[in-house]
Amino acid sequence: MRTSHMLEHLMEALRCLPGVGPKSAQRMAFHLLQRDRKGGLQLAEALSQAMTEIGHCNECRTFTEEETCHICTNPKRQDNGQICVVESPADIAAIEATGQYSGRYFVLMGHLSPLDGIGPSDIGLDVLDYRLRRGDITEVILATNPTVEGEATAHYIAELCNAHEVNASRIAHGVPVGGELELVDGTTLSHSLLGRHKI
């Protein structure tokens, strides 16, 4: 079926979203045009405003419309000297939802990947190095993803911490709550055994 140029353009634009293929984009476009034009206009306005006004925190690099985000400006967050290093702002949301952490963050916006040409400065490790040199950080909690790249990134940052005599710790990896051992992959089970603790 031949569609209008503007409709094709809308569907192509929707495909930039993760997990949205041609069929999903077509379904979304038709829904907005046929059933929810007001919602479509609100979406367009919110996207336009977010794309122009949301930047990065000058301390932790997460998304914010201010120069410094609400976490970094919170005096209670600065007292404990902890900084949790994560790969994306979505990781902050996940950790905050637990209610178990009350320190500050540093967002890498990715991980080291020499094969893809992503080096230390590409993920802000020069900025992290500067923050470590300031002397107000006593512990770095490495919460990068448990992938090969995430582990390499965590190791690199741990070396950086050692150079500045700052404690570095890695979040635990292992068997998920409610998981069955026979269904857990070997690497995860190995991490669980190596990271065991007394009860």
Swiss-Prot record:
One Pfam family linked to the record: RecR_ZnF
PROSITE patterns, sorted: RECR (PS01300), TOPRIM (PS50880)
Residue span(s) of domain Toprim: 81-176
Listed GO biological process terms: DNA recombination; DNA repair
Swiss-Prot/TrEMBL keywords: DNA damage, DNA recombination, DNA repair, Metal-binding, Zinc, Zinc-finger
Superkingdom: Bacteria
GO molecular function: DNA binding; zinc ion binding
InterPro entries per UniProt: DNA_Rcmb_RecR (IPR000093), Rcmb_RecR (IPR023627), Rcmb_RecR_Znf (IPR015967), TOPRIM_dom (IPR006171), TOPRIM_RecR (IPR034137)
Positions annotated as zinc finger (C4-type): 57-72
Keyword Flavoprotein attributed: no
Entries under PANTHER family matching the protein: RECOMBINATION PROTEIN RECR (PTHR30446:SF0)
Role this protein plays: May play a role in DNA repair. It seems to be involved in an RecBC-independent recombinational process of DNA repair. It may act with RecF and RecO.
Family from the record: Belongs to the RecR family.
Family annotation (NCBIfam families): recR
Entry protein name: Recombination protein RecR
Organism: Vibrio atlanticus (strain LGP32)
